[in-house]
Amino acid sequence: MKEWIVATKNKGKVAEFEAILGKRGFSVKSLLDYPAIEDIEETGSTFNENATIKAEAIAERFQRPVLADDSGLIIDALDGRPGIFSARYAGEEKDDQKNIEKVLRELQDIPWKARTARFHCSIALARPQAETIVFEGTCEGYITTEPKGTGGFGYDPIFYVPSHDKTMAELTQEEKNKLSHRYHALKQLDKWLD
């Protein structure tokens, strides 16, 4: 069994990586397994840059392949915000509830048809002595007027997926794994592994 390090401490992201990579026979370790490693500062201006920064920093330390993801919510009516600042949109404490409240306040006068949004995910694969490769995926939807559902994490309770007539937080983990932005990026990685 091959072991991959996923450069995140986000349990929700780890679960998505495990669900998808586990089917391929990979074992997933995350930065939760290495508590001594400090957070990597995301100094990039794009999802791709931030994912690459994290993957390369951890790969250099461990001298083995590392996957890092940077993802976020892009809302058209907010000119792409929160974007790369999705996790800390309402402040550095990275509070999901406060982030949701801020988005809903900013969209309160925006009609449904203009509440289009997408989750974007960039996954960087960094390997010692090799060029870093980035895989991207998106999931299109709308921002609801109020949170619905208890599953998932982050903005899932306000991200409506038209094809399922539910928010991401109302989907089962299995349903989410088949349509999420991370799933689409991991599918690109999976193709590359073949």
Swiss-Prot record:
Cofactors required: Mg(2+)
A cellular component annotation (GO) from this entry: cytosol
Record-linked Gene3D superfamilies: 3.90.950.10
GO molecular function: dITP diphosphatase activity; ITP diphosphatase activity; metal ion binding; nucleotide binding; ribonucleoside triphosphate phosphatase activity; XTP diphosphatase activity
Binding site for substrate: 8-13, 71, 153-156, 176, 181-182
Binding residues for Mg(2+): 41, 70
Record EC number: 3.6.1.66
Family membership noted in the UniProt record: Belongs to the HAM1 NTPase family.
Name assigned to this protein: dITP/XTP pyrophosphatase
Organism from which the protein derives: Halalkalibacterium halodurans (strain ATCC BAA-125 / DSM 18197 / FERM 7344 / JCM 9153 / C-125)
Upper classification of the organism: Bacteria, Bacillati, Bacillota, Bacilli, Bacillales
